[in-house]
Amino acid sequence: MKCSLIITTYNRPEALELVLLSVERQTVLPEEVIIADDGSDDKTQAVINNFQSNKILNIQHSWQEDKGFRAAKSRNKALSISTQEYIVLIDGDMVLHTHFIEDHLKHAQKGFVIQGKRSLLTKKRTSSAIKNQTTLFSFLDNGLQNHKNSLYSNFLSRLFASKKTHLKG
């Protein structure tokens, strides 16, 4: 199975750059990366152009005019141009674990949505990560605000995972 990775963003080119670096470092690359841009300026476009020129990722830029906060419309526009049957949605400040896409594809099942949690970095640790282009973080990192979400364990994942079949959408 292949997937589209949709990344929402708005005027945080330095964060988007770090996210795209983490995407390039995946053990399994997404078939396409679509940047769902809610009206960012030229600095975001420059970051996207730089990654497009690397040719490691197949990146499309789905941009809409800045008319206020319209993230849902931006995401929907990106969804409409995706070419894969499996979609992964993330925010433009989510640095991915190296197995993020691989794990999504491994656990994908028709009729189910996979939802996870993220680890939050302190403002100081975020600045440091952007400056040093750090995409790997340790469970013991002092800059984490919620350490438990940074644990990576297939055993624990299976132990705490739950399927909710009663939800309708």
Which residues are covered by each model-predicted region?
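Glycine-rich, basic loop-to-helix element that forms the pyrophosphate-binding segment
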Residues: 65-82, 99
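Conserved donor NDP-sugar-binding/catalytic core segment of glycosyltransferases
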Residues: 99-136
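Cell-envelope/extracellular polymer assembly enzymes that use nucleotide-activated donors
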Residues: 2-4, 32
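Short, flexible, basic/aromatic active-site loop/helix in glycosyltransferases
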Residues: 133-169
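Hydrophobic/aromatic residue at the end of a short beta strand that borders the catalytic acidic motif
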Residues: 90, 95-97
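A conserved acidic beta->alpha catalytic loop
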Residues: 22, 29, 37-46, 68, ...
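Short aromatic/hydrophobic "clamp" motif used to bind/position activated sugar donors
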Residues: 87
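Short, well-formed alpha-helical segments that are part of the catalytic scaffolds
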Residues: 12-25
